[in-house]
Curated annotation (Swiss-Prot):
<dbReference type="GO" id="GO:0008984">
    <property type="term" value="F:protein-glutamate methylesterase activity"/>
</dbReference>
<dbReference type="GO" id="GO:0050568">
    <property type="term" value="F:protein-glutamine glutaminase activity"/>
</dbReference>
<dbReference type="InterPro" id="IPR011006">
    <property type="entry name" value="CheY-like_superfamily"/>
</dbReference>
<comment type="similarity">
    <text>Belongs to the CheB family.</text>
</comment>
<dbReference type="InterPro" id="IPR001789">
    <property type="entry name" value="Sig_transdc_resp-reg_receiver"/>
</dbReference>
<feature type="active site">
    <location>
        <position position="292"/>
    </location>
</feature>
<dbReference type="GO" id="GO:0000156">
    <property type="term" value="F:phosphorelay response regulator activity"/>
</dbReference>
<feature type="domain" description="Response regulatory">
    <location>
        <begin position="8"/>
        <end position="125"/>
    </location>
</feature>
<keyword id="KW-0597">Phosphoprotein</keyword>
<dbReference type="InterPro" id="IPR035909">
    <property type="entry name" value="CheB_C"/>
</dbReference>
<feature type="modified residue" description="4-aspartylphosphate">
    <location>
        <position position="59"/>
    </location>
</feature>
<dbReference type="Pfam" id="PF00072">
    <property type="entry name" value="Response_reg"/>
</dbReference>
<feature type="domain" description="CheB-type methylesterase">
    <location>
        <begin position="157"/>
        <end position="348"/>
    </location>
</feature>
<feature type="active site">
    <location>
        <position position="169"/>
    </location>
</feature>
<comment type="function">
    <text>Involved in chemotaxis. Part of a chemotaxis signal transduction system that modulates chemotaxis in response to various stimuli. Catalyzes the demethylation of specific methylglutamate residues introduced into the chemoreceptors (methyl-accepting chemotaxis proteins or MCP) by CheR. Also mediates the irreversible deamidation of specific glutamine residues to glutamic acid.</text>
</comment>
<dbReference type="GO" id="GO:0006935">
    <property type="term" value="P:chemotaxis"/>
</dbReference>
<dbReference type="InterPro" id="IPR000673">
    <property type="entry name" value="Sig_transdc_resp-reg_Me-estase"/>
</dbReference>
């Protein structure tokens, strides 16, 4: 009988109460072992060297060396633990997204200081994300891209002949940063994105992607028009559906269907794209856990469209792309660094 070693976890938080609660929650989960706690960034780096944890749960706002400083210090080590950020939406959302772009694998939304007793409610989500992180592959964060140069005149754009829809989960902020930073300002198709991320963070994701991208990136609002030069990111907590009226395609936000495991759902976005754009849709499934996107990829293929998947070699978690590929729905696959060439081949 094979004995499976427990996942070794180090809890990092400057709040003694948070350290206590997170330790209790994680220690009570089967297959997890909390090997230590750290009160700040420097303490965390010392404990990482001493205890060799598999996963770090990381607070971001700490005295001295903060969470981003810890991530930067760990970035040079291939043996570094995987990081799950435990952060509050609102003022910390920008920091949390920066941490995901810098290599953190997962994000758990922590209650604000006024509701610390609700930390116990994080249990199931935190345990699941620690387990996901333990199986993730470390990928170097993308090189900081120069800020897109402002153009003195608007880019002349023809009406879109294709639509690109993208679905991703674990590792998604890193992957989207790398992909979008490579797209030229005259990329001919509008893009719609569905990213699994806790509620309250997509506005910050859109802002940070916009800073790295020659295209304009927006958090979806109901009625926003999709057009070439524009990237629309589904708002966390709601589905993004696409509605076409002749040459005009609009974003629609909706909680229905409620039965889906994720809001936004990649399947819901892809299925609406297949209905509205038919054979002119290119669906792209990037790194992520689970199988969200399989039903949507099937709808795109049945409509005559194209489905591309990220290769295992560049995925943080090869779950969603694998599920699509194993279902026989992938038209083609490529690592992230080859995805722009693949898009150019399939986008008109």
């Amino acid at each position: 009988m094979t004995v499976v070693s427990p996942i070794r976890v180090l809890v990092v938080d400057d709040s003694a109460f948070a350290r206590k609660v997170l330790r209790q929650v994680l220690s009570s989960a089967e297959g997890l072992e909390v090997v230590g706690v750290a009160r700040d960034g420097l303490d965390a780096l010392e404990k990482v060297a001493e205890l060799s944890p598999d996963v770090l749960t990381l607070d971001l706002v700490m005295p001295g060396l903060d969470g981003l400083g810890v991530l930067r210090a760990l970035a040079s080590s291939a043996a570094a633990p995987r990081v799950v950020v435990v952060s509050s939406a609102g003022e910390e959302s920008e920091l949390a997204v920066a941490a995901l772009q810098a290599g953190a694998v997962e994000l758990v939304n922590k209650p604000t200081a006024l509701a610390t007793e609700r930390l116990y409610e994080l249990g199931g989500e935190l345990v699941a994300k620690v387990r996901t992180a333990a199986g993730a592959v470390a990928r170097a964060p993308p090189e900081p891209a120069p800020s897109p140069e402002a153009t003195s005149a608007p880019v002349a754009r023809a009406a879109a002949k294709s639509l690109v829809v993208v679905g991703t989960s674990t590792g998604g902020p890193q992957a989207l940063t790398r992909l979008l930073s490579e797209l030229p300002v005259d990329f001919p198709a509008p893009l719609a994105l569905a990213l699994h991320i806790p509620t309250g963070y997509t506005e910050a994701v859109a802002r940070r992607l916009n800073a790295h991208c020659a295209l304009e990136v927006f958090e979806a609002v109901d009625g926003l028009e999709l057009r070439p030069g524009r990237v629309v990111l589904a708002r966390s907590g709601q589905h993004l559906k696409l509605e076409r009226h002749g040459p005009v395609t609009l974003a629609r936000l909706d909680r229905q269907p409620l039965r889906t495991a994720h809001h936004p759902s990649v399947d819901v976005l892809f299925e609406s794209a297949a209905r509205s754009w038919g054979s002119d849709v290119v669906g792209l499934v990037l790194t992520g856990m689970g199988d969200d996107g399989v039903a949507g990829a099937r709808a795109i293929r049945e409509a005559g469209g194209t489905v591309l998947t990220e290769s295992e070699s560049s995925c943080v978690v090869y779950g969603m792309p694998r599920a699509v590929k194993e279902a026989g729905l992938a038209t083609d696959s490529a690592p992230l660094e080859g995805m722009l060439a693949l898009l150019r081949r399939h986008v008109r």
